[in-house]
């Protein structure tokens, strides 16, 4: 048992107190050095469209080798599956442990056993719990029908599986490290949450619950990131994002909203810039 004046115990207590108080505010005037991305390897789950695709392209443009893990082909041209320096698609279902593990193993072979960045952006749209109940209850048999679980399967379970594998590989690779990597670089684990990680979105019960869960998952590992290869963890929680063409726009999760609603929309570029700042600045952890 550690003594009351044990320096290590004091350090751990101080770190816990710091996280309870919250991390310091980000200075957005500070320069972001994108050069640190050169030669790094990144995995982006759900990187074939939307925010994930935007982050994947930005990392690739800055010299990072990017592996996109998704069920779909990339939504835009330019993803070259034969060029190791371009985003490469590895098809997988993040809600399946076996599929996700196989994809991570493929990426490690492709990257010559290197992994520096993992961005967890895979997600699916919500179901309206009122619609589910009313449509299935009116004129139906008296036995309730099981509600769909795909939102939990992808948004929460898939994120947990992906985070688990990222932390496992970060830890494993550190144990094999030759110590030549720059001491200022830390492996990066970036969770993509949502506005729904913090506030309610009426009737989007499965989506809100899953995104609150993502935030809880991130907070549960943040204070012990040094145990997992010394990694740095952050959470981005985008609001409604303008990431579609035409008369409708979407949230970060892709759920459509009407342009007639009085909602201020963010831009994909804003979220991408935030993601790169989190990944490139080792002073940000929150």
UniProtKB/Swiss-Prot annotation:
Active site: 207, 211
InterPro entries membership: NAD(P)-bd_dom_sf, Sc_DH/Rdtase_CS, SDR_fam
This protein's pathway: Secondary metabolite biosynthesis
Subcellular localization(s) per the UniProt record: Cytoplasm, Cytosol
The protein's name: NADP-dependent dehydrogenase clz5
Keyword flag Protease: no
Binding site for NADP(+): 49, 51, 93, 207, 211, 241, 245
Family: Belongs to the short-chain dehydrogenases/reductases (SDR) family.
Pfam families attached to this UniProt entry: adh_short
Subunit and partners: Homodimer.
Source organism of the structure: Cochliobolus lunatus (Filamentous fungus)
E.C. number: 1.1.1.-
């Amino acid at each position: 048992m550690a003594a009351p004046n044990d320096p290590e115990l004091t350090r751990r207590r101080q770190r816990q107190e710091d996280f309870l108080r919250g991390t310091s505010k980000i200075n957005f005037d500070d320069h972001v050095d994108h050069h640190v991305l050169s030669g790094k390897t990144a995995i982006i789950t759900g990187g074939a469209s939307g925010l994930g695709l935007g982050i994947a392209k930005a990392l690739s443009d800055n010299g990072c080798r990017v592996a996109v893990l998704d069920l779909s082909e990339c939504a835009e041209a330019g993803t070259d599956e034969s060029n190791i320096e371009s985003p490469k698609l590895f098809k997988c279902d993040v809600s399946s442990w076996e599929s996700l593990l196989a994809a991570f193993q493929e990426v490690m072979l492709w990257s010559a056993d290197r992994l520096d960045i993992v961005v967890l952006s895979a997600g699916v749209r919500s179901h309206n719990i009122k619609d589910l109940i009313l449509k299935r209850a009116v004129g139906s048999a008296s036995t309730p029908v099981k509600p769909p679980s795909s939102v939990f399967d992808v948004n929460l379970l898939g994120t947990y599986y992906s985070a688990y594998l990222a932390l496992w590989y970060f830890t494993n690779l550190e144990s094999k490290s030759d110590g030549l990597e720059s001491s200022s670089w830390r492996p990066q684990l970036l969770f993509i949450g949502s506005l729904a990680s913090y506030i309610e979105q009426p009737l989007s019960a499965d989506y809100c619950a899953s995104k609150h869960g993502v935030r809880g998952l991130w907070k549960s590992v943040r204070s012990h990131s040094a145990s997992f290869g010394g990694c740095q963890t952050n959470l981005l929680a985008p609001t409604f994002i303008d990431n579609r063409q035409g008369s409708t726009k979407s949230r970060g999760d892709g759920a459509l909203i009407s342009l007639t609603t009085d909602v201020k929309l963010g831009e994909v570029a804003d979220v991408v810039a935030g993601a790169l700042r989190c990944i490139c600045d080792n002073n940000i952890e929150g």
